[in-house]
Each structure stands twice: as structure tokens, then as C-alpha cells.
Amino acid sequence: MILLVSPKDVAEAYEAIEGGADIIDVKNPPEGSLGANFPWVIKETREATPEGMLVSAAIGDVPYKPGTVTLAALGATVSGADYIKVGLYGTRSYQEALDVMKNVTKAVKAVGENKIVVAAGYADAYRVGGVDPLVIPRVARDAGCDVAMLDTAVKDGKTLFDHMSIELLKEFVEETHKYGMKCALAGSIKIEEIPMLKEINCDIVGVRGAACTKGDRNEGRIQKDLVKEIVKVCKE
């Protein structure tokens, strides 16, 4: 299983790289679950990351404003991100989510056909009025995305598994694979929960808190030794 680690700055990115992460995912935790960082942080992270290692960028827990979101996606793309992650926070339906993701995909793929577009929903969408998480694979497929993802919108100590059963998560993974896409799962995932994701054939696991000191995504800092421990679990 591939490990995606989410640094907030270049110093943390180096720790993630040295720890053996597969994907370096630039985000800005104070701005939310998939908080967007600044273009220059994405650019600096891309420059610091070895050639051949993929860099991802979250572009925010986005509203239903397709034009605004598409511009943000383009900004992340030209700043050097290989993966463009869109948090479908303010989309209330399949149609709204599709509207956002179709336009994002169009903009990103115009820059580079090999760029990877990620449609991210939330396992706890019921808490924020977001689109049903089980709709995300269909949204991703119909919009021409490459990855369907789930995270958690509210970071209050509850994990992905507090909001969706392993059976529902397996259904999400299987539907995503049926459509020929990769599946990514995140959401305050603890290291001891990773084997469950492997069992349901998840392709990519995303972490920040688990790789940070004190397990704190906001106040903690990513440390390479913690990343190494997670890598070991992902690869064994």
C-alpha cells in the first residue's frame, strides 16, 4: 500500500522524504482537513523532492464555486503538483460535485495528461452537509478523475472508522476499483488501523497526525522516525 504523508512546509517535507513516504502531499492544516497551502510552498516542496517522487497538493475544503475551484487547481498544477486533491466540502449533491470535478479535470489535464486528479469526499459529510461519501466513486469516474478519496471533515479526534464501518469502506474501495481508478483513504488514521485498510485493498493511505509528534496534526511536527514506522506497516 502506498503511503501519502502531508507536510505543511519544506522542513516537514524533508522529514517525510527521509522517512520513506511514497507521496509528499502539501497541505495547510489551519485551513482545514484539505487546507490549501501557498503556491510557493508547493513549488519549494517540488524542488526539494527527489525526481520521480510524486508531490500532491490539497486545494482546500472547497465550496460549490466551480470557477474558483478550477483556478485553485490550475494554480497547484503549475506550481508543480503531480496530484491535485479537491475536498468536496460545499457540494451538496452528485451533480454539484460532478460540476466542480469535471471543470477541475479539464483544467489540470490541459496542463499535463499525466497529472493525477483526486476527488475527495468526507466520511463525516453528514456533519457538514456534504455530498454522500458513497457517491464519490461515481463522481470521480464521470468527471474523468484518477483517484477517489475519503477523509474526515471535522478533526476532533474521531477517525475514518468512527464514521464508516469497514463494510462501507470496502464497498467504497471495490466500487472505485470497478471503475478503474485508485482509492485513497485518510481521516486521522492511527498506525494500528492501517492493516484494516490493507485488508480491504486500499491503494493509498494518507496521514498527517500519525506522523507528527504527540500525534497532533496542528501543533506537532512530522518526524522521519514516525514516518518510518508507518512505512513499515504499509509495506509488510
Swiss-Prot record:
MF (Gene Ontology): carbon-carbon lyase activity
Top class in the EC scheme: lyase
Pathway the protein takes part in: Cofactor biosynthesis; methanofuran biosynthesis
Listed EC numbers: 4.2.3.153
InterPro entries tied to this protein: 4HFCP_synth, 4HFCP_synth_arc, RibuloseP-bd_barrel
Origin superkingdom: Archaea
Active site (record annotation): 27 (schiff-base intermediate with substrate), 85 (proton acceptor)
Reaction catalysed by this enzyme: 2 D-glyceraldehyde 3-phosphate = 4-(hydroxymethyl)-2-furancarboxaldehyde phosphate + phosphate + 2 H2O
GO biological processes: methanofuran biosynthetic process
UniProtKB keywords: Lyase, Schiff base
Assigned protein family: Belongs to the MfnB family.
Physiological role: Catalyzes the formation of 4-(hydroxymethyl)-2-furancarboxaldehyde phosphate (4-HFC-P) from two molecules of glyceraldehyde-3-P (GA-3-P).
Protein name as annotated: (5-formylfuran-3-yl)methyl phosphate synthase
Natural source organism: Methanococcus maripaludis (strain C6 / ATCC BAA-1332)
